[in-house]
Amino acid sequence: MASIAIYSVKGGVGKTTFAVNLAWCAATISRRQTLLWDLDPAGGSGFLLGVDPKKKRAADSIFSASRDPSKLIRKTDHEGLDVLPADESIRTLDRQFESLGKKKRLVRLTAELSKNFDRIIFDCPPVLNEVSAQVMRAADLLIVPLPPSPLSTRALETVVGEVRGSGKGHPPILPVMSMVDMRRTLHRQAREAEPKWPVIPLASAIEQCAVERKPVGAFAPRSPAARAFAQLWTAIERKLAMG
């Protein structure tokens, strides 16, 4: 089993779209039993997978009580892909972790869920607090979507510093340039500055995910966006195999 965190210190970089599409690739391309665990109280991952929230807010009960996390897992319409949706109850999850005094709570929960899943993908909130620290300890690989701008390297340095501060054995980091439009001079310059970073293009098919409530590969499998996510997932599997 491997756990992969999609993390950014700022919003608006396509983090949730990354999480949903990579989870779909894990289940569909690699045929892995995959769980997408939404840790962002906005609950975008469940929405994009067509899973409507339940009226009772209970996502935080996994962390505060001895509740079986599998009881909150929801099936999706995509074979091999389940989601553990978020809700407003985890908005104060950082304080909850601190009050519990359990710095490896997420690690233990992930280990428990790994009995039934080959890949666990975290959709993380854009925060620097105890939630992000718990994710750093639980993840085997960190995917960091970054906008194509001169500030990308600086944003990555912030994440690297946070990861290194999380303790020994921190996960490797894979930066990905997100929402790239090669017609724009600034985007081309950013791409030229970091030629080894994988790229996800700015594409209408990706924006359409919110309308279709499906991963792009499910409704536009031949689109450049679908190919880009498939290539990124292949790179992720390769990196995981290398350890």
Tell where the protein language model's regions lie, with residue ranges.
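P-loop NTP-binding core
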Residues: M1-G243
